[in-house]
């Protein structure tokens, strides 16, 4: 039947849970990209200055990181995982519905902190559940999972765009400190075709401001539409809970007689079962605990140093690549409008959309590619492509055409790095480590830290440092990946892996070798 036939067979057997995990990542994508284009309207709504509204970004990113690190608490049983996904996806709809009523920036930051916790929980739990369900065949399904992030991230700005205010709600005399570069991070995320004439404003609060032309009311419609669009996602999780008989209102009713197949399954010794072929609720839950439990597990005491080195180097690779994704999408506009390029505001506003568009396209293309190419090879191509692209951008830093081509190229190379890296690292550790939690946490820390670091360097050294930072961080990612390959080659494998598990790995290696 071949590799493709086995993968399609696995998908048919696990169709409903797979579609459910994909859909919750669509919620993740919706929530991660809406703040940028709506930030100016939200600033008018909350009567806040740019430094004040910046806490909204910080609270979301910080709580996303906390949610990713603590999400492992809900992964010990299938019931806990599904209830966590249901609560998180429902919370995202509630956040969208409540945002129009947040008239104070502190309240808005608190609401976005809740959204960040929900997003972090979704990030960890959905990734881990797919890896647990498909194991060596998980690369294709992880690529689809992260495609839905890009799809949601593309859709939310498109929904918000018709409702954005074209009028400036700030008074004309509030243009002091317009040369301040400290706010480029925030302005770069929101200056698009509807805000091409906007400039950074002063660090003061405007208590008497009211949005003109009903701007606050109009943008409220965008949030309510996104809340409705996201509402089927928690319903899908609820249906999966019902199917698995995990709803408290649906008591389990056992049949009086078992069929021959069910009887054979009941009487089969558990130690001879193939974990990858069992439903998720029967699979082993060891090795995928939260970050703190992973560090305290007694069976890790005898693990070789390469076991820990694989965790660390894998997390460092994603620290760099995911951090570059966040930093580039945040600062590419600011870099374009500065000298020497001096691109017009309207033209530069297309760069973040181009970047996310090619990330989505890359994740779509990587779905068939990942079924025919090893994850290690895909990560190598991605990391080398990132370094080469930044070098080309640095050499041709005066050419606007190369900036657009390089932005599209970076989107393609960065698109599939995370799912490929996750599949490769889990495969290297034979699904017995804490790779999912550690890698998700490392990626979250990188996205938060590198944005702050690049922003500080950009402000202090000028626009040229933006590309220099990209080259440096790309080279660091490549170095950490070479170290990961080295530690993987030295890794002897875990002694606790049963013999049959090893034979399963040899069988799967026909189409998914390490």
Curated annotation (Swiss-Prot):
The keyword Signal does not apply. InterPro entries: MFS, MFS_trans_sf. Gene3D superfamilies: MFS general substrate transporter like domains (1.20.1250.20). It is found in: Membrane. GO terms for molecular function: transmembrane transporter activity. Glycans are attached at residue 177. The chain crosses the membrane at residues 19-39, 53-73, 82-102, 107-127, 139-159, 221-241, 307-327, 347-367, 376-396, 400-420, 438-458, 466-486. It is a multi-pass membrane protein. It holds the Pfam family MFS_1. One of its GO terms (cellular component) is membrane. Keywords: Glycoprotein, Membrane, Transmembrane, Transmembrane helix, Transport. Belongs to the major facilitator superfamily. PANTHER family: MAJOR FACILITATOR SUPERFAMILY DOMAIN-CONTAINING PROTEIN 4A, SODIUM-DEPENDENT GLUCOSE TRANSPORTER 1. This is Major facilitator superfamily domain-containing protein 4A. The gene is MFSD4A.
């Amino acid at each position: 039947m071949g590799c493709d036939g086995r993968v399609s067979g696995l998908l048919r057997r696990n169709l409903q849970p797979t579609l459910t995990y994909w859909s919750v990542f669509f919620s993740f994508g919706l929530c991660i990209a809406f703040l940028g284009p709506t930030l100016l309207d939200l600033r008018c709504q909350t009567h806040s200055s740019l430094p004040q509204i910046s806490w909204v970004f910080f609270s979301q990113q910080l709580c996303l990181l906390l949610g990713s690190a603590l999400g492992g608490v809900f992964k010990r049983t299938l019931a806990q995982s599904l209830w966590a996904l249901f609560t998180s996806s429902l919370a995202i709809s509630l956040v969208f519905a409540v945002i129009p009523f947040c008239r104070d920036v502190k309240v808005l930051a608190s609401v976005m902190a809740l959204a960040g916790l929900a997003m972090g929980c979704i990030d960890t739990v959905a990734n881990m559940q797919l890896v647990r369900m498909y194991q060596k065949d998980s690369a294709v399904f992880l690529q689809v999972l992260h495609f839905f992030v890009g799809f949601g991230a593309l859709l939310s700005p498109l929904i918000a765009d018709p409702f954005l205010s074209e009028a400036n709600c700030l008074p004309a005399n509030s243009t002091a400190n317009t040369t301040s570069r400290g706010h480029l991070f925030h302005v770069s995320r929101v200056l698009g075709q509807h805000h091409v004439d906007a400039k950074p404003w002063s660090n003061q609060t405007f208590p008497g401001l009211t949005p003109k032309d009903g701007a606050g009311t109009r943008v409220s419609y965008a949030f309510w539409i996104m809340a409705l669009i996201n509402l089927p996602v928690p319903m899908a999780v609820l249906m999966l809970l019902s199917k698995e008989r995990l709803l408290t209102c649906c008591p389990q009713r056992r049949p009086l007689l078992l069929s021959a197949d069910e009887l054979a399954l009941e009487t089969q010794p558990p130690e001879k079962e193939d974990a990858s072929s069992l439903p998720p609720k029967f699979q082993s839950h060891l090795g995928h605990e939260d970050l703190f439990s992973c560090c305290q597990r007694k069976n890790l005491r005898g693990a070789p140093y390469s076991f820990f080195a694989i965790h660390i180097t894998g997390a460092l690779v994603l620290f760099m690549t995911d951090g570059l994704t966040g930093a580039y999408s945040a600062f590419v506009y600011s870099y374009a409008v500065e000298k020497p390029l001096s691109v017009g505001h309207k033209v530069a506003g297309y760069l973040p959309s181009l970047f996310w568009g090619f990330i989505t396209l890359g994740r779509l293309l990587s779905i068939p590619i990942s079924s025919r190419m090893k994850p290690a090879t895909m990560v190598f191509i991605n990391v080398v492509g990132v370094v080469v692209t930044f070098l080309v951008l640095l050499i041709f830093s005066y050419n606007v055409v190369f900036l657009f081509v390089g932005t599209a190229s970076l989107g393609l190379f960065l698109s599939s790095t995370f799912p490929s890296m996750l599949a490769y690292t889990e495969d290297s550790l034979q699904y017995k480590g804490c790779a999912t939690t550690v890698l998700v946490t490392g990626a979250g820390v990188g996205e938060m830290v590198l944005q702050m670091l690049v922003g500080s360097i950009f402000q202090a050294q000028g626009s040229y440092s933006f590309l220099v930072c990209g080259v440096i961080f790309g080279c660091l990612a490549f170095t950490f990946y070479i170290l990961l390959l080295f530690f993987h080659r030295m890794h002897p494998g875990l002694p606790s892996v049963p013999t049959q598990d090893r034979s399963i790995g040899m069988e799967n290696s026909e189409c998914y070798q390490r």
